[in-house]
Amino acid sequence: MIKKLKFVTLFVGGIAFLSACSDDAFNEIESSLPKDPNYNTDVYTATVSVSNIKEKAIQTNGLSGYLLGKYTQAPFGTKNATIASQVILPSANPRFGALTQADETAKNTPENEKVTEAYLYIPFFNINSSNSRATYNKDTEYQLDSIYGNKDASFAINVSELNYYLSNIGTDYQPKTYYSNDTDIPTHIGTSVASVTSYTISNKSITRYQFDDPKTQDDESKKEADVLAPGIRIPLSTSFFQTKIIDKEGSDELSNAEKFSKYFKGLVISTSNFSKDLMMLLNMAGAKIEIVYSYDTTNNGTKSTLKSRYELNLGGGITVNLLINSDENLSDSAKTYLSGALGQTASITIADTDITKFKEGNWLITDASLYLYVDNSVTYAKEPDRLFVYNAETGNVLVDYQYDPTSAAETAASSYLIHLGKLQKQNGKGAYYQLRITNHLVDLIKNSTNKNIPLGIAVASSVKVTTSGVYLDTSGANHKIALTTLATPLSTVIKDVQLIIHYTKAK
């Protein structure tokens, strides 16, 4: 942080000084500068080796967002994404209606709870998603984030019960990692809970209304209960949730969260029959099941039927993305393939001979940047705006990430512009990415104990996400990866990679 402040202070101070100088002052300064400096400045193109990395499977639990849908981009083929998620009991021993099940039995006053509606709601990401206190206005359109493909596409959604327990502890008693090619989930899909044959997403907020109280003259059903962020909201089977939840009031299955998670193991959400490609990044932290039910009550001898709403959470438990790729054609070994979700990354290694040359030559590195040049012979539906560079052995960010003066910018689009430059375009097409690794290279030269580790390169969904995870290569060995690449289906083909170094050296 201190280094950042020094950089900004010097930069701003320099601007102020230059602004205050007159032309005469500049001439005076120029005449006082040495005519023959005792150093040379030069540019050097270092030798790097680049390897394509094909992911057999990738960790897909513990993510900030989850993909659902279908996306096609030649030559990377078609990506399909399905979501499996636990359902979380918000509190132990829930009461449905005005009385507990024990009181209903003791007083012989059955409330006859009956499910009338049930819904699955999963919000999209939008400009307010990072604010947990954000409120939404009725019938208002919002700018959605991370929707890839055609937003007008229609598609089918199927929701089924999951009959496989998603444990958070593996057989080695360590936190369990779930992979994109998990085989237990697809073979344990149970009863269909919803089947919507044609669905189209909307960027409008979702308004829920209160329930009418027959004891009053007002019609409360016309009043707002709350307004939800734009998202997927589909009807679920009322009979399923009648049996699975409401009829279990007072039972052992609903007595605590652990027993509930083994009783109702979760849901699997899949899509099909797309009119056009559409891949959505969903905010599963805000996902929930809404159960609307009626119940009988007696007040001062007057019987009436009321309605209430009960919610189960999908956020807060284990969620897994199942990812399938098909029709890939990545045959040109001279090119570098980078693809998000279950896809491809690359490994870049700086030649040891060059590292030795930098050390022995006492070079003062002023800038070291990786340039990745885009292959424009490929037609891209949408090009990734950012790439991510990281330590390929640990999955951690480089030192340049920590000292980027734009790191505090509010949005990811405005952050880390020095270290992780945006895609530069020419004639409307992507030309190159510039990834500045100056501090990484300087540390490598100055510190003899630092290892010349390979650098991982991946498509980034957000440069603010620094979490690392695990992927399996084609041999089944596991390696580290930056998980920001998981939350996007976008891809690019790189035709050339160069490490260009600007330096000064004493004469």
Regions found by a protein language model. Give the residues of each.
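Secreted, disulfide-rich extracellular signaling modules
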Residues: 2-507
